[in-house]
A protein has these predicted regions:
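Non-catalytic pre-domain segments flanking phosphatase-related domains
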Residues: 1-41, 47-100, 105, 113, ...
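C-terminal cap/substrate-recognition subdomain and adjoining C-terminal extension
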Residues: 2-36, 131, 150-151, 167-365
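Phosphate-/polyanion-interacting regions in eukaryotic proteins
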Residues: 45, 50-57, 107-214
Length: 365
């Protein structure tokens, strides 16, 4: 049956026309054959990094359930105390380390905790105008960038997740909704923040930079709908935390409308009351690189007579294993970012889909 006569129809949107055509043909070929597709979330299903934007939102709104002592513990947890690499200096050219940064962050957090987090002595607007908040914000972002630049991806991810400790899973989902709604409405692009020039502390004056904002990709949401409509199951495997992706991928206000049981992301352990603790739940593989393939092998393939995914979508090296390791995969959909997955673009199975950096929209070229 030709695509012209088929019931498979992807919205034209901003797809590269050839990519859209080949995706339609793939869906037509595998419709109602007990097949499935797997996708990354951040910068693949959406524009932007959901976990990063939650981290930004927590700082901007001081949404923490940690007392100062526990906060001080988690921001240092498992982080080596040796100096960072050459590129991670303060504005005076001094190379920094976790001890100097954490000491300053902890001192600022005590003030923020006593005056806003635990007791609203100041309004959010007032607390944001304090030197303590300015110093806290910039040094948190500096440290957040320094960790993956100096240590393992696992350490950096867990450090970020541990800032959610003390919240219930439902509280995290509510926070995820608030953060996602807010960041969908903000400009996308890099933001630079500088620490206090008055409260310089042990780390001195630093600048932090972060990539702010999120965008929905309607073409990807439509692809998921069309796959499902034709009997092809859709799975998400993400390196963000589970509760966050569950909200974005399944809440109908965002339009992806995926099944919650098909979401596999990072998971912390929790108490009997569903309060998250600062320990990873290794009953599930760590969903980066090889761990993404392990999720498919352990939890997904057995449902499909040990068949691999027919289609895999990703954008970065963390997705490379699941993009390349399954012989049944006919299309690798790469949502192209500069300098990412260049080693795969000559694979005959690859469809490269570009994006507009200024708008976050797909680029049909």
């Amino acid at each position: 049956m030709s695509i012209e006569n088929s019931c498979v129809r992807l919205d034209e949107g901003r797809w590269n026309p050839k990519n859209r055509e080949l995706l339609e043909k793939l869906i037509e070929k595998y419709r109602n054959t007990d097949s499935y597709a797997v996708f990354d979330w951040d910068n693949t299903s959406i524009q932007g990094d959901t976990q990063l934007n939650l981290f930004i939102y927590q700082i901007e709104n001081l949404v923490y359930k940690l007392n100062p002592q526990k906060f001080n513990e988690v921001i240092r947890k498992n982080v080596p105390t040796n100096n960072f690499k050459e590129g991670f200096k303060n504005l005076d050219g001094e190379i920094l380390n976790i001890t100097k940064l954490a000491n300053d962050i902890y001192k600022n957090y005590i003030f923020l905790y006593e005056n806003y987090i635990s007791d609203k002595k100041l309004s959010l607007k007032e607390i944001r105008n304090t030197e303590e908040f300015k110093d806290f914000r910039a040094k948190m972002h500096f440290l957040h960038n320094a960790l993956p630049g100096n240590f393992s991806e696992e350490l950096a991810c867990l450090w970020e997740f541990y800032l959610l400790v003390g919240m219930t899973k439902d509280e995290i989902k509510n926070l995820a909704k608030e953060a996602t709604d807010t960041k969908l409405g903000e400009a996308i692009g890099d933001v630079v923040v500088e620490s206090s020039r008055i409260l310089t502390g042990e780390a001195g004056i630093v600048r932090g930079i972060y990539d702010n904002g999120l965008r929905i990709r309607p073409e990807i949401a439509n692809l998921y709908h069309e796959l499902k409509r034709n009997g092809i199951d859709v799975y998400i495997i993400s390196a963000s935390i589970q509760e966050l992706i569950e909200v974005f991928a399944t809440d109908k206000s965002y339009g992806y409308n995926l099944d919650i049981e098909n979401i596999y992301a990072m998971r912390l352990k929790s108490t009997i009351d569903n309060i998250l603790v600062d320990e990873y739940n290794y009953e599930y593989p760590f969903t980066q690189r090889k761990g993404k393939s392990e999720i498919i092998e352990k939890f997904i393939k057995p449902k499909y007579n040990d068949k691999g995914p027919i289609l895999v979508g990703g954008d970065a090296v963390g997705d490379e294993n699941m993009l390349t390791e399954f012989k049944d995969t006919e299309i690798l959909l790469i949502m192209k970012r500069e300098g990412k997955l260049d080693n795969l673009v000559n694979d005959k199975r690859v469809l490269v889909q570009y994006r507009n950096l200024q708008t976050g929209l797909l680029d049909p070229k």
